[in-house]
């Protein structure tokens, strides 16, 4: 390391770039892992060598103490150091790549090394939508905070709220006088950032100002515990084997209804709604959709943590399609877990989402794939894999569903039903009898000498009509 430093030192001195040289010196000091500001009885070779170098650098006692107290550095100091480090590493990598190409000195081995280095830098520092930024690439051993404050802040518009994280315990009036450590549009992004960067551990106490949200301390603590359980820190070291291949998702944690109450009216009245309709996508006689949002937190093989948010009435379907498309694209199904800690029916909601993802994955990623019928409230969704991508056909009501089922098909395509779709209806029983190459006829006698006849053809289409009939025997003849 010292030999390498001497080469870099000569180069930067010749170019008169003292700031870059100081960064290299700080990196070498951190790598040496000695604390020269503290007296010690040990006079090992490493300490003696670093003392000699530090005298050459003209570092004073104050600078040594600052470097030796890195464990006390907080987010601000670490972020500033990281920004300079990222800028220098990126610049050096680009220069090295361009120099090698322009001078024709890159052989096959060097090309592989450069590729791995580029991917390592990309994984560690590249910024992209949804990616959780890592602010502490080994600069300080510990960024954890004993006390934090989490608050929802309102913007200019009614829907322009954001979430901010502050150091220490602050009251609501004190928030305006402090600069947040980080703020994000959505809560899951912020807590994922706090976890990935080690600001929050099991000992951290967080004061919560939920604003207009339904977030409670109970929910927040459980969300953080779920992140610690599924993405324990430190993450395993990134290997050359992993970097030599394209990144692929390894683990996915679905956080459902973060900071939301799916049944706010019953909560306000302190009531518990009991119904035989327990499906989270069609709850109670009103068939309420209790899945209001899903935040998908995914760790890939390059140790990148990403958060994707889906919200609104189609949140569950959109999250499901995103998961299936990525699993099919990478030919790999990431380990999936679901967590929900909202006020009403949280366990049932989490179980429902996990079952749905498992069932849909089994049907749509099979070879050959099946179509998948899902009922959300009183509407229906048909999921079908076409050209490697999950396609959605939305049908507003049962009449449109029956027209879809009766449309002619070019080839046999089995239709799998979600466990809650068409519950208690004979249509579901018929569709489950579908067989390639078989034509099946079903009938039901109705009042006023009428009969309902259903034909399930050899390609999986279901056609239905009504006609007059005198009795069952006449109908069958």
Language-model features, listed with the residues they occupy:
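Short, hydrophobic/amphipathic alpha-helical patches that form generic packing surfaces
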Residues: 6-9, 22-37
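Extended, well-ordered protein cores
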Residues: 34, 43-48, 52, 432-433, ...
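Structured alpha-helical bundle/scaffold domains in large eukaryotic membrane-trafficking regulators
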Residues: 39-43, 65
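Eukaryote-biased recognition of C-terminal alpha-helical segments
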Residues: 65-108
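C-terminal subdomain of alpha/beta-hydrolase-fold enzymes, centered on the catalytic histidine
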Residues: 22-25, 51, 73-80
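Long C-terminal appendages of very large multidomain proteins
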Residues: 56, 91-477
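Structured mid-domain segments that build the active-site/substrate or prosthetic-cofactor binding neighborhood
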Residues: 1-17
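Eukaryote-specific, cytoplasm-facing alpha-helical/coiled-coil scaffolding segments in long proteins
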Residues: 49-62
